[in-house]
Regions:
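Conserved donor NDP-sugar-binding/catalytic core segment of glycosyltransferases
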Residues: 95-128
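Short, acidic, metal-binding catalytic loop of nucleotide-sugar glycosyltransferases
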Residues: 25-35
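A conserved acidic beta->alpha catalytic loop
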Residues: 26, 42-50, 90
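Short, flexible, basic/aromatic active-site loop/helix in glycosyltransferases
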Residues: 115-121, 130-159
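Conserved donor nucleotide-binding strand/loop of the catalytic core
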Residues: 36, 50-77
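A short, conserved alpha-helix in the catalytic core of glycosyltransferases
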Residues: 161, 165-168, 172-176, 184-206
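N-proximal low-complexity "stem/linker" segments adjacent to membrane-targeting elements
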Residues: 1-26
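Short aromatic/hydrophobic "clamp" motif used to bind/position activated sugar donors
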Residues: 83
């Protein structure tokens, strides 16, 4: 796009050759009249991730791997006032960026948000109820329980962003100092980041962090 991007989509990767193409195609095919850019922050993959990603996005090779470091490293190289962080196995629908941008334009007090998550790669499970046969995935209850978890976190005024999709205003991201560098393999980057945002909003006496139940993304259930 010729005009300066208003949205920067940032995807950290490390050996994601089996997932990255689908995710980037989903971002590339957005029906969005807002200028946006696609940035891949690669942590020195040893597979074909970078080769694939360069067909769809601007790729930066970071000096070391680690999701927090990779994301923080590329943010200064982006232009958008709205930062969209996606995992390499997360899929968005074709109107995702348009809808997200409108939400932030309408709600000036919104600091950051995540869309609801649905896990897409579970195995089908069939069961019979009376004469009817029903089929669900083995992630059905995981999807439901995760939805309840984030709903009640928000209800109790301790909202938690979802790591596979975090959308935040650039200025707010910079105010909290980006993602905290946690020890390797320690789960909880998104919770620590959410807590930093909650602290900032209370200190500033303004700002909201939300999970959007009316917008969803698909992501892998791998852990």
């Amino acid at each position: 796009m010729n005009s300066k991007p208003k949205i920067s989509v940032i995807i950290p990767t490390y050996n994601e050759e089996t997932n990255i193409k689908k995710s980037l195609i989903a971002v590339k095919k957005q029906r969005c009249n807002i200028p946006y850019e696609i940035i891949v922050a690669d942590g020195q993959s040893s597979d074909e991730t970078v080769t694939i990603a360069r067909k769809f996005a601007k790729v930066y090779i970071t000096p070391k791997k680690g999701k927090s470091f990779q994301v923080n490293y590329v943010v200064p190289k982006t232009s958008g006032d709205l930062l969209v962080f996606l995992d390499a196995d997360t899929l968005i629908d074709e109107f995702f960026l348009q809808k997200i941008y409108r939400i932030f334009e309408k709600h000036k007090n919104l600091f950051a948000c995540s869309a609801r998550v649905k896990y897409y790669d579970g195995k089908a499970i069939s069961f019979k109820l009376g004469s009817q046969v029903f089929s669900i995935t083995n992630y059905f209850f995981l999807n439901f329980s995760m939805h309840l978890y984030y709903f009640f976190k928000t209800l109790l005024r301790y909202p938690e962003l979802i790591g596979c999709n975090i959308i935040i205003r650039r200025g707010i991201f910079l105010k909290v100092g980006g993602f905290k560098q946690l020890p390797p393999n320690l789960i909880g980057m998104d919770k620590v980041f959410s807590d930093s945002l909650i602290y900032l909003s209370r200190k500033m006496k303004k700002g909201k962090i939300r999970t959007l139940n009316f917008i969803s993304v698909l992501t892998s259930g791998r852990f």
